[in-house]
């Protein structure tokens, strides 16, 4: 012990806990020799940068652990805007190599190991495989299948298979032809709405009414969660809501004009306005109860 103290006197030297050797005092007048001196590797100057020794980059270790090629084989960051479009660059940001390379350039090589963790590779590889819903990964597809039923055939969820299916396309074609000959403001949308509306009505025709009970039992057992049936298209609902906004009650002349414009029957427009008035009444009642229960609002 005395021999060691004779070789390295404590008065002229200083012990750094991050190092395994002694550094003399005059070395702190400038940057130490073990730190990189190039300006590109040090874009920012930190007050504590002289105390951090240069260690082995963590990037190479993590790439070796997960059997991915080192970051030197990837394209440089500054060449990305010239070679790829903006969308591809956005997708490439999810890759672990470019993420760590950009962090190394922004924060300097001395602090790259602080911002990089081995779990980043796992998370990027996990979330890069997007499931069927387009947002969550593939592991969450099982929850969407149980919640919404079989999403592969939404048409069969809307309409149960009926025995008069051969007559429905003929009726739909006839209504499409008549609507195209009329040439109203909502031609294509009204034809699509007419076709969707004719399909459930054809199932209740007198020819196929004998097998309705069998169809209902088969459809209920085949699919547990049935989607809500809407006989009106979005365009028709928008026009009906606009008319309801101006007047809650509609006269016969306006009703006939609306049914002609939206390719609906007079009875359908009348029933829609009745249902909409009941809905508005319920909304007002619930709103009144809510504000009476909360007097501070």
UniProtKB/Swiss-Prot annotation:
Cross-referenced InterPro entries: DUF3528, HD, HD_metazoa, Homeobox_CS, Homeodomain-like_sf
Segments of this protein annotated with the region Disordered: 151-230
Recorded GO CC terms: nucleoplasm; nucleus; protein-DNA complex; transcription regulator complex
Single GO molecular function: DNA-binding transcription factor activity, RNA polymerase II-specific
Record-annotated disulphide pairs: none
A Pfam family of this chain: Homeodomain
Keywords: Developmental protein, DNA-binding, Homeobox, Nucleus, Transcription, Transcription regulation
Keyword set includes Cell wall biogenesis/degradation: no
Binding region for DNA: 225-284
Record's subcellular location: Nucleus
Keyword Nucleus appears in the UniProt entry: yes
Main subcellular location of this protein, as a coarse class: nucleus
GO biological process, one term: mesodermal cell fate specification
Biased composition annotated in UniProt, kind: Low complexity: 167-192, 202-222
Role: Sequence-specific transcription factor which is part of a developmental regulatory system that provides cells with specific positional identities on the anterior-posterior axis.
Family: Belongs to the Abd-B homeobox family.
Protein's name according to its UniProt entry: Homeobox protein Hox-A11
């Amino acid at each position: 012990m005395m021999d060691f103290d004779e070789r390295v006197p404590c008065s002229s030297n200083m012990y750094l806990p991050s190092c395994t050797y002694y550094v003399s005092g005059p070395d702190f007048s400038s940057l130490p020799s073990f730190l990189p001196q190039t300006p590109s590797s040090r874009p920012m100057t930190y007050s504590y940068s002289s105390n951090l020794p240069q260690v082995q980059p963590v990037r190479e270790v993590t790439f070796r652990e997960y059997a991915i090629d080192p970051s030197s084989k990837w394209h440089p960051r500054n060449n990305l805007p010239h070679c790829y479009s903006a969308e591809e660059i956005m997708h490439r940001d999810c890759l672990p190599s470019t993420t760590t390379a950009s962090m190394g350039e922004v924060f300097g090589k001395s602090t790259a190991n602080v911002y990089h963790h081995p779990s980043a590779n796992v998370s990027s590889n996990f979330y890069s495989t997007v499931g069927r819903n387009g947002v969550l990964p593939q592991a969450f597809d099982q929850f969407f299948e149980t919640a919404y039923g079989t999403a592969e055939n939404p048409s069969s969820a809307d309409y149960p298979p009926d025995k008069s299916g051969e007559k429905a396309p003929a009726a739909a074609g006839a209504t499409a032809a008549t609507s195209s000959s009329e040439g109203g403001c909502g031609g294509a949308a009204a034809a699509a709405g007419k076709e969707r509306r004719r399909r459930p009505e054809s199932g209740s025709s007198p020819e196929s009414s004998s097998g309705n009970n069998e169809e209902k039992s088969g459809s209920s057992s085949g699919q547990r969660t049935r989607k809500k049936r809407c006989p009106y298209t979005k365009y028709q609902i928008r026009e009906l809501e606009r008319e309801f906004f101006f007047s809650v009650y509609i006269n016969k002349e306006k009703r006939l004009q609306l049914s002609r414009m939206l390719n609906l029957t007079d009875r359908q427009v009348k029933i829609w306005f009745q249902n909409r008035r009941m809905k508005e009444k319920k909304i007002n009642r619930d709103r009144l109860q809510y504000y009476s229960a909360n007097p501070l609002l």
